[in-house]
Regions:
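N-terminal structured subdomain of primase-like DNA metabolism proteins
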Residues: 1-102, 158
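Conserved small/polar residues in nucleotide/adenosyl-binding loops
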Residues: 3, 333-339
Length: 339
């Protein structure tokens, strides 16, 4: 963690009015500045910024804080990410961070979990290309995916043995306590792989590190799609599938889809700015994450009742994040072709 003196210097060199004015329009009102709150929908400005106190407060929704908390909330940053962003803004070079014992243990755990996820993703990928993975490969082929697309997204297959990955990782020396933290296993009836007989979709963060998985069952078992649980690495509400690729697409919008196959099919068709909300319920955190990379979002959820309702729920969330939104009419499609 950075010293309190260094953090205070970062804050003092970033005038809160200048910083917030880069995100929303502020108007001077007496000794303060006011504007429309970026954290909730409103027609009359209730968001106040005090230059003398270097604080902001919304009288509508109650949020408030200093320049660091504003950047954290608006950009969906961690505390350290916000400090680094503000330091970069004013050309400050930050020293290497010294961590407490607890913080270092947390970092070490996350490093190990990333290592396990990378091994698991590689294992699933090789399973897909093996004789045992033909059912998964056939599924992907029938949906028109090329080898290039399969490789680009690191798609895999989990196999039909419900203990295969567990044994594979145990043979590599990982202990049960660590494996339990990974979210890759269930414990209701002994230790079993969470994903088996499923086509696997590695979920990556913006730095292309595997933080979780999605799996589509081969057959009629339920649920059809299964995601990793929340772990030290994976928070579904703060990530978007495909953003690691889409953020470098250099397009003037992002396309939000419902599922993994929707995104992959979009990318293969040339729409490499497509992402998925890991389910139909878009969150404010995901909307703010998109705002980092674009000002416009195109919604392409399924045209069934659930998809339509999800799109209607998403529109105000995207608007609150400062994103303009358009809904693409998918009624020409009579079935979920990418399922």
């Amino acid at each position: 963690m950075y010293s309190s003196d260094l953090i205070e210097e970062v804050v003092s060199r970033n005038d809160i009015v200048d910083v917030i004015s880069g995100y929303i329009k502020l108007k001077k009102n007496g000794s303060s500045y006011v504007g429309l709150c970026p954290f909730h929908n409103e027609k009359s400005p209730s968001f106040s910024v005090s230059q003398s106190r270097q604080l902001y407060h919304c009288f509508g929704c109650g949020v408030g804080g200093n320049v660091i908390t504003f950047v954290m909330e608006y950009e969906n940053f961690t505390f350290l990410e916000a400090v680094k962003s503000l330091a970069d803004r004013v050309g400050m070079e930050l020293p290497e961070i010294s961590y407490s014992q607890k913080e270092q243990q947390e970092r070490d755990l996350k490093t190990k979990l990333l290592e396990i996820n990378k091994i698991a993703a590689t294992y699933y990928y090789h399973q897909l290309k093996s004789e045992n993975g033909q059912v998964g490969l056939s599924y992907l082929r029938k949906r028109g995916l090329t080898d290039e697309t399969i490789n680009r997204f690191g798609l895999g297959y989990s196999g039909q043995n419900s203990k295969a990955l567990y044994r594979y990782l145990k043979d590599k020396g990982y202990d049960d306590d660590l494996l339990k933290e990974s979210g890759l296993f269930t414990y209701e009836r002994g230790i079993n792989d969470k994903f088996w007989n499923r086509v696997m979709f590695p979920i990556m963060d913006i730095n292309n590190k595997v933080i979780g998985f999605g799996g589509r069952v081969m057959g009629d078992a339920k649920p059809k799609y299964l995601n990793s649980p929340e772990t030290k690495l994976f928070d579904k509400s703060r990530n978007l599938y495909g953003l690691n690729i889409a953020r470098t697409a250099r397009k003037n919008n992002l396309i939000i889809c419902e599922g993994y196959m929707d995104v992959i099919s979009m990318h293969q068709a040339g729409f490499n700015q497509a992402v998925a909300s890991l389910g139909t319920a878009l969150t404010p955190g995901q909307a703010r994450l998109m705002k980092r990379y674009t000002d416009q979002v195109l919604i392409t959820y399924d045209s069934d009742e659930a998809g339509t309702k999800a799109a209607m729920r998403a529109i105000p969330i995207l608007k609150e994040a400062g994103l303009s939104t358009k809904v693409i009419n998918c009624l020409l499609y009579t079935s979920d072709a990418a399922d």
